[in-house]
Amino acid sequence: MDLFSSKRLRHSQTDGRRANHEMKFDSRSPIESDLGRVIFSSACRRLHDKTQVFPLTSDDNIHSRLTHSMEVMSIGRSFALNLFEMDEFKVKIGVDSNNLKQCVRGLRDLESLLSTICLAHDIGNPPFGHFGETALQCYFSNLFEELEDDLKHSSGSKDFYNETILSMLKTTKPAKHDELIQDLADFLADGSLAKFDYIYFDGNAQGFRVLTKLQFLNDLYGLNLTSASLASFVKYPNFGAKDKRSISTKKHGVFSTEKEELKAVMDNCGIPALGDTAYYRHPFSYIVEAADTICYLIMDYEDAISKGWVRYEDFKEILKNDPNGKKVLNESEKHFNENAPSKKKMVQLRTELMNHFVNVSIDNFMKHYDEIIAGNYKKELVFDGGEQESLATKIQDICRKDIYSNPEIESLELTGNAVLTGIIDYYMKYLFHPEKSFRMHAKHLMSKAIFQAVMQEHYNAVGEKKDAWDFYDDFDPADFSFEERIRLIRDFVSGMTDKFAVTHYRKLNGQQI
């Protein structure tokens, strides 16, 4: 395996200039340069106004996706530094401990790679947190059921088709009608990989699409990150059906539109395939997952304390009832007096808990490394307590009970669902409208970069050698297929921030000018 593959999907002239020492004050490796590409991307900036747990909060102390991702990045860096102190780890990744140059290069690349992917791990998440994913899944599942029912009962009669199908027929030449209906039927068929991209919508899959395509400048290579970074990013390297028997296929982790990109980066890293539609995980994806879990377990609880929903004393009681938790608690209490403020106590406890979970994760990573490489390890590092229930599992159960099901969160999640459903309804109506003027109005309200990215995919799919930006002004959305139009809607909506989505929804409904 080449776990640090610096190959990109498109050749980078900048990498070549660095290698030839043409860039005097830039000695970064290709993997190191990936971090800058993510930090300076618009998709990363938008994380500042996306929900972590608490939707539409005005409390500046509460985590957004961006602050959460920055903390995950910090933990990822800690993993890199701790792992590289272990000679056993260096042997496993092919670094000679006696070769200073190899050690420096290896540490710099590992630290940068984990920092990059930890920062980017939520870059594809829609507005309103994980409930936003559920809202998109439900919308498209219901839509497809309606369309399937129409096709099933129409018997070819246009009188029974719904508005979406009729609009497509009205904007298509009669000679192409049968082909259009057949294409729609194929898309809706059971086992359709393209259909999975919607009914199993996942922020991880959208994130891979953002990194590989949707940061659109003048081609469909997105940020053009190294294969090592992209392979490590993919939490569920699977573009087929979900299958919980394997950790790789637990979710539909890559859209069918990016299956060739997945194959390329995995092949570049030497990651074996798992059947026809999946791959083993890149080993470093386990580390990224652990860093994410450590942060959300602890910081979500800390946010709940800030909001007054739970108390430090409640958290203390959880830890007292676990042998490892008790050790962590005792260690943290050495650093403050009993009458210290709760905030001081929680910060110290956070530090000790993070240290504990990092150590647990590293121990499990090294203990099971051969299983991980062979694709046989099926647990999360943080939750693997061996024969005993892990401390992380107990904290997660409490978070689900006392935080994630809080009426305030659930109420705002339903608000988010109404907003997302309303926006998609609007674009479904007007991107499929029989009148061109309505379609063009809808087009001009959408992100130009995302529209051009889908245009470029369309041209590539039909074999037309055109550049999207040259034809954008006159392009009619009716020239898109059904799937391309809903792909455009999905990409646009999932990229919105919480506040932009609310404002956009109000404007579309005439509630705001």
Predicted feature locations:
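Sequence-structural signature of the catalytic-core scaffold of metal-dependent phosphohydrolases
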Residues: 1-27, 39-50, 59, 66, ...
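Acidic, low-complexity proline/glycine-rich segments
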Residues: 32-45, 384-391
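Substrate-recognition/cap regions that form aromatic- and gly/pro-loop-enriched pockets
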Residues: 370-465
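C-terminal amphipathic alpha-helical interaction region
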Residues: 444-507, 511
